Swiss-Prot record:
Annotated residues for binding of (6S)-NADPHX 1: Y160, D178
Residue ranges constituting the YjeF N-terminal domain according to the UniProt record: 29-235
Region (ADP-dependent (S)-NAD(P)H-hydrate dehydratase): 249-560
Cited PANTHER family: ATP-DEPENDENT (S)-NAD(P)H-HYDRATE DEHYDRATASE (PTHR12592:SF0), ATP-DEPENDENT (S)-NAD(P)H-HYDRATE DEHYDRATASE FAMILY MEMBER (PTHR12592)
CDD domains assigned to the protein according to its UniProt record, in alphabetical order: YXKO-related
Protein name as it appears in the record: Bifunctional NAD(P)H-hydrate repair enzyme
Region listing for NAD(P)H-hydrate epimerase, in residue ranges: 1-241
SUPFAM superfamilies: Ribokinase-like, YjeF N-terminal domain-like
GO BP annotation list: metabolite repair; nicotinamide nucleotide metabolic process
UniProt similarity note: In the N-terminal section; belongs to the NnrE/AIBP family.
Cofactor: K(+)
Region named NADPHX 2: 417-423
UniProt keywords, alphabetically: ATP-binding, Isomerase, Lyase, Metal-binding, Multifunctional enzyme, NAD, NADP, Nucleotide-binding, Potassium
C-alpha cells in the first residue's frame, strides 16, 4: 500500500537518495557555491550551466508536447539559469520567448555569460516595459519562472508582483527554477505575490522554504538535482552544518524496519495513560485511545469522565478506563498522581477542557514527570492552553496570577497547532507562521523537551540536542476535528514502546500520522476533502509493519 503513494521529492540518481533527506540554509549554499564548483574543477558559470541543464531536463520530460516555452528572467542568477534553459529548449526545437525584467545595474557575471551564450545561438529577448501590460504570445503553452531566486526576503517589488499575478491567472502550466518567485527560501513565507508552480526544480540541496510555511501552495511537485555534487555535499563538514532533516515516506522503513521481538509481551511494549474527555469532549479521548492501542502500545489506560466509560469500552475494549468523578482539586490531583505511577508514558490533553479537571491533570502530570524524568509526557490541546496560562498568568491557567515555575522535562513532547503556539509564545499566529522553524525552537525551550509544531511541513525540534526535522507527509484533509487527538495517541503509544529517543519518536509519530492521511486520500482517487480522523487509525498497522529496505541499507553519512 505504501508503494502506491507518490514521492514528494523526485531524484534522478540513487546517489541523491541520502541528500533529499537533509535540508540546508539557502544563505549557507550561496556562500558555499564557489567551493562546490571548485570541487568539480569548474567555475560558477559551469555550475549555472549544470543547473540550467538539469532544470531543462526535468521540465522537458514533464512537458513533452509543449512547443512554445516562455522564459521569464530576472536580474539575478535565477535569470541566468533561465537563459541556459532557453538555449537548451531552442536546441531541442522548441519555440522560445525570453522576457526580461528591466534592471538598472549589470547582470551578475555568471548570468551575463549565460545571456551571451543564449544570444550566440541566435536567441533573442524582450525587456518588459515598466507599467505596461504584459504582452504574451497567444500560443505559449509552458511558462518557466526565472524571476527571483533564493535571496528574496519580503514581498516582490510591484513590477515583479504584477507579472507574477498575471501569469498565475493564465491557464498554462508553470514551472519554477530553484524556488517559486516570491517564496522565502528560509521560511516558506509568501509575503506578497508568489508564483504558483506546478513543478519546481531545485539544485544542490533542499532549502527549508520549499517544505514548510506556505510552500505547499506554491512549490507543486518538487524535483531535486544535486548537479554531481553528491560526494562533496555528503562530506562530514557539510553534513554537520545541515539545518535539519527532511522526514519523508521512505523513513517509515527506518523507524519501523526493526521487527518486534518474538519474546515481546504486553508489559515489555509499554504502558500508556491518556487523560482527557472532560464533560462534552468524550470523543477526543476515545480517538486518542484507539490510536494508542493501534500503534502498538502494550497497555493503554484512559482517565475520563464517567459518562464516557461505557462508550469508550464499547468502541475500544482493549483499553482500560478509570472514571474520574470528583471535581475537588486536591482529590483530582491525588487520583491522577496515583494512576500515573502505573504508566511508563503520560499523555494529557485530548478533550481535557480548561476547568478544574484539566487544571488538576496538568498540575499532576508536570509534578509526576518532574519526579520521573525517564517517562515521556505528551501535552496537547487544552493542556497547552493551560500551560500558556501558567506562562503568562492568564485566567484559566493552572496557576493563578504570576508565572508558575515550570520543570525542565527533556522527555516531554508538546504538539501545538499555530494558534496554541501563539498562546504559548504570547504572540500572533502570523508571527508563528512567519518563521515556523524559529517558533518551534522557542516552543521546545518552554519545557526543555521536544516540540511538534503542526501545520503543512510539520516542524519537530528537540531543545537538548538542537535537532530539527521537517516532516514532509500529510495533506489538507487533515484540517478537521480529531486529527490532533489521533496524533496524541500515536505519540503516546510509540513513546511507551521506547523504540527510539524522544526526538525520533516524535518524528515517527508525525510521519505515521501524515502517511495515514495520504493513504486515505489516495484510495480510489478519493482526495482530501471529508477525511475523518478515525479513518487514519485503521491505516496505522499497515505503516508500522511495512516491509521495505532494511535500515542498514540507508545508512546516514558520517557527520550526522
Amino acid at each position: 500500500m505504501l508503494s502506491r503513494l507518490s514521492e514528494r521529492c523526485t531524484i534522478a540518481t540513487g546517489l541523491e537518495q541520502v541528500l533529499r533527506h537533509y535540508v540546508w540554509s539557502a544563505a549557507w549554499l550561496r556562500d558555499a557555491e564557489p567551493a562546490a564548483a571548485a570541487s568539480e574543477n569548474i567555475d560558477l558559470s559551469g555550475l549555472m550551466e549544470r543547473a540550467g541543464r538539469a532544470a531543462y531536463d526535468v521540465f522537458a520530460n514533464l512537458y513533452t508536447s509543449q512547443k512554445h516555452w516562455l522564459i521569464l528572467v530576472g536580474s539575478g542568477n535565477n535569470g541566468g539559469d533561465g537563459y541556459v534553459i532557453a538555449r537548451h529548449a531552442r536546441e531541442a526545437g522548441k519555440i522560445v520567448t525570453v522576457l526580461r525584467m528591466p534592471h538598472s545595474k549589470p547582470l551578475p557575471t555568471e548570468a551575463a555569460s549565460a545571456q551571451h551564450a543564449w544570444k550566440a545561438v541566435g536567441g533573442t529577448e524582450s525587456t518588459m516595459s515598466p507599467g505596461a501590460p504584459l504582452q504574451l504570445p497567444a500560443d505559449v503553452d509552458l511558462i518557466v519562472d526565472g524571476l527571483l531566486g533564493t535571496g528574496i526576503c519580503g514581498p516582490p517589488r510591484e513590477q515583479y508582483a504584477d507579472v507574477i499575478r498575471h501569469i498565475n491567472g493564465l491557464p498554462v502550466p508553470r514551472v519554477a527554477i530553484d524556488i517559486p518567485s516570491g517564496l522565502n527560501a528560509e521560511t516558506g513565507e509568501a509575503a506578497g505575490a508568489c508564483v504558483k508552480a506546478d513543478h519546481t526544480a531545485t539544485f544542490i540541496c533542499l532549502k527549508p522554504g520549499l517544505l514548510t510555511g506556505q510552500a505547499k501552495d506554491y512549490v507543486g511537485q518538487l524535483h531535486y538535482r544535486s548537479l554531481g555534487l553528491e560526494d562533496w555535499m555528503t562530506a562530514p563538514e557539510r553534513m554537520r552544518v545541515a539545518l535539519c532533516r527532511r522526514v519523508a515516506l521512505d523513513d517509515v522503513y527506518e523507524y519501523f524496519g526493526i521487527r518486534r521481538s518474538a519474546l515481546a509481551h504486553k508489559g515489555s511494549c509499554g504502558k500508556a495513560i491518556l487523560v482527557g474527555g472532560d464533560h462534552g469532549f468524550g470523543g477526543a479521548a476515545l480517538m486518542s485511545a484507539e490510536a494508542c492501542v493501534t500503534v502498538g502500545a502494550g497497555l493503554t489506560r484512559v482517565l475520563t469522565r464517567p459518562e464516557y466509560a461505557a462508550p469508550l469500552l464499547t468502541r475500544c475494549p482493549e483499553a482500560m478506563v478509570t472514571a474520574v468523578e470528583t471535581d475537588t482539586g486536591e482529590q483530582l490531583k491525588q487520583q491522577m498522581l496515583e494512576a500515573f505511577e502505573w504508566a511508563s508514558t503520560l499523555a494529557v490533553g485530548p478533550g481535557l477542557g480548561t476547568g478544574a479537571y484539566g487544571q488538576a491533570a496538568l498540575t499532576a502530570a508536570l509534578r509526576h514527570a518532574e519526579l520521573h524524568q525517564d517517562k515521556t509526557l505528551v501535552l496537547d490541546a487544552d493542556a497547552l492552553n493551560l500551560l500558556a496560562g501558567c506562562l503568562h498568568g492568564r485566567e484559566g491557567g493552572a496557576a493563578a496570577g504570576a508565572r508558575k515555575h515550570l520543570p525542565v522535562l527533556p522527555n516531554s513532547i508538546i504538539t501545538p497547532h499555530p494558534g496554541e503556539a501563539a498562546r504559548l509564545l504570547d504572540c500572533r499566529v502570523a508571527d508563528v507562521e512567519k518563521d515556523r522553524l524559529a517558533a518551534a525552537r522557542r516552543l521546545a525551550a518552554i519545557l526543555g523537551g521536544t516540540c511538534l509544531l503542526k501545520g503543512p511541513g510539520t516542524i519537530v525540534h528537540c531543545h537538548s540536542s538542537a535537532k530539527t526535522a521537517i516532516v514532509d507527509a500529510g495533506n489538507a484533509g487533515m484540517a478537521s476535528g480529531g486529527m490532533g487527538d489521533v496524533l496524541t495517541g500515536l505519540l503516546a503509544g510509540l513513546a511507551a514502546q521506547r523504540m527510539h529517543d524522544t526526538f525520533d519518536t516524535t518524528c515517527a509519530g508525525a510521519l505515521v500520522h501524515g502517511v495515514a492521511a495520504d493513504m486515505v486520500a489516495a484510495e480510489d482517487g478519493r482526495g482530501t476533502r471529508g477525511i475523518r480522523a478515525t479513518e487514519l487509525i485503521h491505516r496505522v498497522p499497515l505503516i508500522v509493519n511495512a516491509s521495505g529496505p532494511s535500515p542498514a541499507s540507508r545508512q546516514r553519512p558520517s557527520g550526522q
